[in-house]
């Protein structure tokens, strides 16, 4: 649900040349407000007068052996359909858990709860990881809910999360604790 698109490279490439070609293609229809190669990713940010928010495209530079499947990308606003190699939802959930533990970004919690509500299970996690997740979620403050999460949500949904937090995600983490094993060195 985030207002960004995340991609991963699947084979080595000339990143500078790729960024030049991608920027050139996007500038035909969008204002490119940022385009650079960062330490971990190739980053582009776009805007258009047709949509009120900017779109961030992030292409991770590390090649990983993720669980993927071919999906059809489509939009109700266009007739073009494009096949993509996409992470499975289970892989996406694993990545979101890992990302939240790495960067403590509230949008990762929103994405985890969103997927849980649509039937994607949490990956198997040991008790120490579950405790870290729960503690970090509890540490999220009002500013994160109102500003960071609020900037990507509509008002009615924002009000629910501001008042209840990640109640459903916390419930699922609590359930997972009941069957989790302690990690032993």
Where in the sequence are the language-model features?
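Structured mid-to-C-terminal alpha-helical surface segments
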Residues: 5, 10-185
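Short, charge-patterned binding micro-sites
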Residues: 1-2
């Amino acid at each position: 649900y985030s207002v960004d698109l995340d991609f991963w490279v699947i084979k080595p490439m000339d990143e500078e040349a790729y960024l030049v070609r991608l920027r050139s293609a996007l500038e035909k229809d969008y204002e490119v407000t940022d385009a650079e190669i960062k330490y971990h990713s190739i980053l582009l940010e776009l805007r258009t007068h047709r949509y009120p928010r900017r779109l961030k495209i992030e292409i991770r530079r590390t090649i990983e052996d993720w669980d993927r499947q071919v999906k059809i990308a489509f939009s109700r606003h266009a007739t073009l359909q494009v096949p993509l190699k996409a992470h499975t939802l289970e892989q996406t959930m694993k990545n979101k858990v890992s990302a939240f533990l790495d960067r403590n970004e509230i949008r990762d919690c929103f994405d985890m709860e969103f997927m849980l509500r649509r039937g994607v299970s949490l990956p198997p996690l040991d008790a120490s990881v579950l405790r870290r997740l729960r503690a970090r979620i509890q540490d999220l403050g009002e500013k994160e809910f109102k500003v960071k999460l609020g900037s990507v949500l509509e008002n009615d949904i924002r009000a629910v999360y501001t008042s209840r937090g990640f109640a459903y995600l916390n419930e699922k983490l609590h359930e997972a604790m009941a069957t989790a094993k302690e990690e032993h060195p």
